[in-house]
Amino acid sequence: MTIWVDADACPKVIREVLCRAAQRTGVELVFVANQLLTVPKAPNIRALQVPKGFDVADNEIARRIQPTDLLITGDIPLASEALAKGAQALNWRGDAFSKETIAAQLTMRDFMDTLRASGVQTEGPPPLSQADRQAFARQLDIWLARR
């Protein structure tokens, strides 16, 4: 069982929550990014640096993830790939991606991409709030307790 983190865009506060949980439980935690990341010195926590390029980190995670694993990402297509392989996925706010809702989420993402490509200004997500951080930590603890 491994927690894979799409780390290029992962907020620092979420990385910190993940590291504390991994240190507490001993679960394997892997941050995948195309930049150098500093992680705590622990045998179960590591950073995997991949070459720069479009979706290189995502492709590496998709190649390695297993059905017993958890993915932490804000990337809906990557979450979809993880779910297809039987893994579970959470976003930074603690919302679980599910097989029942991923198709609708992909459709909405594609629609918003189309709007942006046509010049329509769309709002990005709001900054993470304290409630978001707590929701993420709560959902992570629930996942860890099931293991």
UniProtKB/Swiss-Prot annotation:
Record Pfam families: DUF188
Matches recorded under InterPro entries: UPF0178
Coiled coil stretches, renumbered: none
Family recorded in the similarity comment: Belongs to the UPF0178 family.
Protein name per Swiss-Prot or TrEMBL: UPF0178 protein CV_1768
Organism encoding this protein: Chromobacterium violaceum (strain ATCC 12472 / DSM 30191 / JCM 1249 / CCUG 213 / NBRC 12614 / NCIMB 9131 / NCTC 9757 / MK)
